[in-house]
Design a protein with these regions (language model features):
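Short beta-strand His + acidic residue motifs that chelate non-heme Fe in jelly-roll/DSBH
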Residues: 97, 105-110
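Non-catalytic, conserved peripheral segments adjacent to functional cores
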Residues: 1-93, 110-134
């Protein structure tokens, strides 16, 4: 696995009323600090890629549908430079995926329905100076 990437398996607690699933807690080893939470979606078969952040950690959790998330480590000096990781996240694999700064990432919705991804990131989005480098 790419250096700095972490996976947290999530527990789903079902009962006769429905389900509860904790995503992140303040005391999780995987989670260094709070910046903001946002929801992004992907339509079936659509790819959103490639970009990285200079400072920000992302924590992806797909809560509806399924997505394939791909990571690429291009960091100079990283013991895993050049490594590619693929993860499947969603209703059938409830995990949080931590993506460290400077690791390229993108995702594709798989299956026949729109997928919902929650990201709990460590930086607040700055519209005047985004911490985001995209490959076009």
């Amino acid at each position: 696995m790419i250096d700095g990437v972490m996976v947290k398996q999530l527990r789903v607690l079902p009962d006769e009323r429905g389900r509860l699933m904790e995503i992140l807690r303040e005391d999780d080893e995987i989670y260094p600090r709070f910046g903001q939470v946002y929801l992004t979606t992907g339509y079936p078969g659509v790819v959103k890629a490639w970009h990285y952040h200079k400072v920000q950690f992302d924590h992806f959790c797909v809560v509806k549908g399924m997505m394939k998330v791909v990571l690429y480590d291009s960091r100079d000096g990283s013991p895993t430079k050049g490594e590619v990781n693929e993860f499947f996240l969603g209703e059938h694999r409830p995990i949080v995926l931590r993506i460290p700064p400077l690791v390229y990432h993108g995702f594709k919705t798989i299956g026949g329905e729109e997928a919902f991804l929650i990201n709990v990131c460590t930086q607040t989005y700055r519209y005047d100076a985004p911490d985001r480098k995209s490959v076009v």
